[in-house]
Amino acid sequence: MNQVFKGWSRGMSTSRGRSMRSKVESRMRKESGKTLREIRRAKKLKKKLMTDEERLIYNLKRAKKKVALLLQKLKKYDLPELPSPVHDPELFTSEQVQAFKKIGFKNKNYVPVGVRGVFGGVVQNMHMHWKFHETVQVCCDNFPKEKIKEMASMIARLSGGVVINIHNVKTIIMFRGRNYRQPKNLIPVNTLTKRKALFKARFEQALESQKLNIKKTEQQLRRMGVNPEDPVAMASIHRVASTFFNAIDKKEGTPYVFHGDKQSERGTSVDNREESEPGDEDSDQEELDRFIAEIEEAADKEWEEEEAAEQEESGRIRYWNREEFAGRSRTPELRSYGDASHGFRRNDRDTHSQRRPNDSDDDDDDGELDSEDDEIPKRFDRARSSNTNTRRPREDFKRRSPDPRPRPRAQVRSDDDVLSDLDNTMWDSEDEEDAPPANYISSSDDDEDENRTVSASSSKQSRFRNNSSRDGINNSKSKSGKQRDEDWDSD
């Protein structure tokens, strides 16, 4: 086992007595390669070994690079200013301005301007307010005082309104004009979309923060005695800082470790670099040009990606219905009404299940709803058949069932349905006790029925009148309670 983990134990163990300089030297010798991975690790190690002045200078250069990149990105969002529309200048007297100002304070309608600034949506909302009001309040609470007048002039140019007053520094009262007519396109042509306005606001916010960061870093450098605007001082700091890294690149050792044989060589290399400073100016110019080209390329690439994302989002919003239903559009009203109709029928079945007779199943309600239209012609057919004297002898002895259609086959039901049937039978038994007894027809009423059929056949009136007369005879021939008891006993 010791032989197996021998290599691992050597790799994980560290020798005692090694100083920090020896560790840095060995690490820098390993990081002197030219591969991408080694270059990244070398840059990371450079940051760790920087002094305070070097770190501040590095942060200052990095912040200036970010500012250049943000300025290049913001150039993409600059829109050409269209010529202002030609209209009659509206001149107001002081009394008219005061009257419109009073109207603007009285009307509480307002349009907020958020982090996106003034874009097409703000102008559209103003036109929607001007449809019913003469004035509108534009609230610019997220912007500094210096930008309010600039925003007021921009809003007046895009909307065609008149600035009446700037109230409490952050609220602009806009008047629509005397001869105002709502334009056909509420969103002006030379305005940003909602998405692009948000990206522009983010870049402007990042630019302001980078400017503050640069100002703070320059103040810290001045406190240390270094003038950030002095090119000579900056060049000397860069020269001192680059001696260490140039020595590593040329594998001449490090300035932290003394090498007697290579000390003179290192001194001569520094002299050669001082002599070759004029040639370095050209390399700096080439590096600057390359940096500008990289910034422009990165800005163009990001703009193209943003345009593609915006087109994809607009297409998704426009055709979301087709994507969801695979090309078949279905309105939400139909979906809601369909679900509601099923729920209504289900609830109606549950509420009426307690009042049904015992011999009807739970699944018969749907059939009863469908068979309501079929019961009307059956009644008329029964009236026609009564004209002919072909009656079955024991037809009147049968109990009249509320549902004339045949009963379906018994289905297998779960335990819950069986329990619900037991509850229904209990309810029905109580209802039968409270309800009046049913009306039965006995054999003693055959003569009366024959007389009714003869009178019905002799009359030449309409079918509707026959039905009404038969109902009247049935109501007049109602039996007493004693006769119904006798009929029950005879059955």
Curated annotation (Swiss-Prot):
This is CRM-domain containing factor CFM9, mitochondrial. Involved in the splicing of group II introns in mitochondria. Required for the splicing of mitochondrial introns found in nad1, nad2, nad4, nad5, nad7, rps3 and cox2 genes. Splicing of mitochondrial introns is crucial for mitochondrial biogenesis and function, plant growth and development, and plant response to abiotic stresses. The keyword Metal-binding does not apply. Its main location: mitochondrion. Residues 90-187 form the CRM domain. It comes from the Eukaryota. One of its GO terms (molecular function) is RNA binding. Residues 277-287, 360-375 have a biased composition (Acidic residues). GO terms for biological process: Group II intron splicing; mitochondrial polycistronic RNA processing; mRNA processing; response to abscisic acid; response to salt stress; response to water deprivation. Residues 453-478 have a biased composition (Polar residues). Highly expressed in roots and meristemic regions of young seedlings. Expressed at low levels in stems, trichomes and stigma. It is found in: Mitochondrion. The lineage of its organism: Eukaryota, Viridiplantae, Streptophyta, Embryophyta, Tracheophyta. Disruption phenotype: Delayed seed germination, retarded growth and reduced size and height. One of its GO terms (cellular component) is mitochondrion. Keywords: Mitochondrion, mRNA processing, mRNA splicing, Ribonucleoprotein, RNA-binding, Transit peptide. Pfam families: CRS1_YhbY (PF01985). Residues 22-34, 255-265, 345-359, 392-416 have a biased composition (Basic and acidic residues). Residues 1-25 form a transit peptide. It comes from Arabidopsis thaliana. Residues 1-34, 255-287, 328-491 are annotated as: Disordered.
